[in-house]
């Protein structure tokens, strides 16, 4: 990537960052490309960038990022579980309206912040149990952590109402 002084406009730098990173970029990505924090703020105010969450941005015009991509960028500690995992493994033909995500108990603020972007049902898990059965899988072209089949079935019995 080129720096601002190399005759690139701020808009060109932003477009290069999104070409390199994807549909959602962090403020640090723009800063390492040569923009200043106040430039990012000004681009948001002009309507060129849109703030997804503190420190995360997307282009204001264009396609909305996939829910899977938003989850992978903004909920780095979330694991797909229960209804969403059942659908992923083909145990259910019912596509859930909201993502079932397991998070450590200390991440309640993170979940509340992301619920404005993606419908999420959070399952708060104790830290010793959180990583048991964790694996990864492709969701619509994006790799997300998901609990394995055995953990999914056990969690369904645990959380049934």
Task: Place the predicted regions along the sequence by residue.
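Helix-start/capping segments and mature chain N-termini
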Residues: 1, 20-21, 33-34, 148
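Short amphipathic alpha-helical interaction segments
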Residues: 31-45
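A detector for short, charged/polar N-terminal pre-domain segments
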Residues: 2-20
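A short, conserved structural fragment
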Residues: 47-54
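Nucleic-acid-binding surface
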Residues: 9-13, 24-29, 44, 56-161
